[in-house]
Amino acid sequence: MAFLEDANHTAVTEFILLGLTDDPVLKVVLFSIILCIYLVTVSGNLSTILLIRVSSQLHHPMYFFLSHLASVDVGYSSTVTPKMLANFLVERSTISYLGCTIQLFSGAFFGTLECFLLATMAYDRFIAICNPLLYSTKMSTQVCIQLLVGSYIGGFLNASSFLLSFFPLLFCGPNRVNHFFCDLAPLIELSCSGSNVPIVPASFCSAFVIIVTVFVIAISYTYILITILKMRSTEGRQKAFSTCTSHLTAVTLFYGTITFIYVMPKSSFSTDQNKVVSVFYMVVIPMLNPLIYSLRNNEIKGALKRQLARKIFS
């Protein structure tokens, strides 16, 4: 049953996810495409994690954080993709209240964690390029673990703020969520809580996360650019640029899409456009990150070649 009656109102116990389309043919096409993307995402990111773990030459802070970013990408994509694939195969796409809660928390947690990890990786590049003599001290194992734990705590706190905004919501009747997953904005639109909707915790925490992480990334790359421009060696400049290009690409893709969805005025784009961009940053970007970080990284390509050669000739 979708509703439970009590003395005061009708409580929703499940939601209907309207998804991306009602067209049966398009559903089959999207199912095939997104399934392929998800399989590439999982295999690509797990391969990245395994390669970093087994290759001693990749046991550096940058790759330590990259392996955790790959883990986050698997978790982030798995938050919505399996359920979305299952919904393509059924006529009525439903999700329980508990399932919606878990999806909301997981999406906020992994999304926030990705923000913090991207900022941490920018700081790591700043230390490596601008203060190379202090790198082993500034980015020691203890410091890396502290930064990682801080990122996870930040992700948990921001995700908890989403639950603080979600739990007080009252759903008096309509339970059709105009999205393919449980995001806070369409859930608030669906609620009958009126002007008392407690969206302040989620809004404040999310804004804080975005401002802080963007500030760290911007300051880090400003100093990196200044340092690179001061280099006299062309080879040194090219090496420094190649080190940062992949990370900057990942940052631009991720922050560009979340800015489109969460920062731009809602009147400037339609709900369907919102859904398409959401698919890009929750499904496509996790697939692209392993490619972005490996194609332009000679150390990763070299480690992969050595591991393959070892397997072939062993």
Curated annotation (Swiss-Prot):
Keywords: Cell membrane, Disulfide bond, G-protein coupled receptor, Glycoprotein, Membrane, Olfaction, Receptor, Sensory transduction, Transducer, Transmembrane, Transmembrane helix. GO terms for cellular component: membrane; plasma membrane. Residues 1-28, 79-102, 158-199, 262-274 are extracellular. InterPro entries: GPCR_Rhodpsn, GPCR_Rhodpsn_7TM, Olfact_rcpt. The chain crosses the membrane at residues 29-49, 58-78, 103-123, 137-157, 200-220, 241-261, 275-295. Disulfide bonds join C100-C192. It comes from the Eukaryota. Pfam families: 7tm_4. It is a multi-pass membrane protein. GO terms for molecular function: G protein-coupled receptor activity; olfactory receptor activity. PANTHER family: OLFACTORY RECEPTOR. Belongs to the G-protein coupled receptor 1 family. This is Olfactory receptor 5P50. It comes from Mus musculus (Mouse). The lineage of its organism: Eukaryota, Metazoa, Chordata, Craniata, Vertebrata. The gene is Or5p50.
